[in-house]
A protein has these predicted regions:
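Glycine-rich anion/phosphate-binding loop at the beta-strand->alpha-helix junction
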Residues: 223-226
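Active-site entrance/lid segments in N-terminal catalytic domains of soluble metabolic enzymes
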Residues: 1-220
Length: 226
């Protein structure tokens, strides 16, 4: 057993120090950003705030509302192939493009999950730009190998993978093919992982450490409740 004794911080442990600004109003602030991703070479322009793939949150309706504001959504996994095809292959060009640029398809790592994804990709003529591979434990060897296999089969899809909380596994997933790594185990207000398993990491320290690891490789992270 190894006990880490150095200080780890959660969001509740810190405050943002105010500084002088040349802006006259908060309305003058633009939070839109452009990112180019390491492995897929794709780019994203929008507000870097994401609705997580939670039941009752990341629905089609929410995705359309957020896309209209330049925000991002990772859809829930529960939609059927037919529903997903209808969503991503809308007949209106502007709607279809907005969904392609601001919505991710979410999936697990079972064979059934992969076959479902293939079916949606085929029926939308490759109309999915982002895929979020979401598991409870991002530290398994199988998960890293799955990301590598997915990258080898889909070179230009933006892969979001998680969740992890340490720099070493962040690096591993990026080197295997992930463009964006989801960071966080247990900090969400309704997440029970820490309570039930005793597994987790103070979120601010996790974000700082994982961001440092990712940026050193030209990768990206997303802070997530997990």
């Amino acid at each position: 057993m190894r006990i880490e004794s150095d200080l780890k911080l959660d969001y509740s442990d810190v405050l943002l120090r105010p500084k002088r600004s040349t802006l006259g109003s908060r309305k003058d602030v633009s939070v839109e950003r452009t990112y180019t991703f390491r492995n897929s070479k794709q780019s994203y322009t929008g507000v870097p705030i994401m609705a997580a793939n939670m039941d009752g949150v990341a629905t089609f309706e929410m995705a359309d509302e957020l896309a209209g504001l330049g925000l991002f959504t990772c859809l829930v996994k529960t939609y059927s192939v037919k529903e997903l095809v209808n969503f991503f292959d809308d007949s209106v060009d502007s709607v279809r493009n907005a969904r392609r640029e601001h919505v991710a398809y979410s999936m697990g790592i079972t064979e059934a999950d992969f076959n479902k994804f293939l079916s949606v990709m085929e029926q939308t003529d490759g109309g999915i730009k982002y895929v979020c591979v979401d598991v409870a434990n991002g530290y398994t060897k199988f998960f890293a190998e799955y990301i590598e296999s997915l990258r080898n089969q889909f070179r230009d899809i933006v892969i979001i993978a998680g969740n992890v909380v340490t720099g070493d596994q962040t690096q591993e997933l990026i080197l295997k093919g992930a463009d964006i790594v989801k960071v966080g185990i247990g900090p969400g207000s309704v997440c029970t992982t820490r309570i039930q398993t005793g597994v987790g990491y103070p979120q601010l320290s996790a974000v700082i450490e994982c961001a440092d690891a990712a940026h050193g490789l030209g990768g990206h992270i997303i802070a997530d409740g997990g």
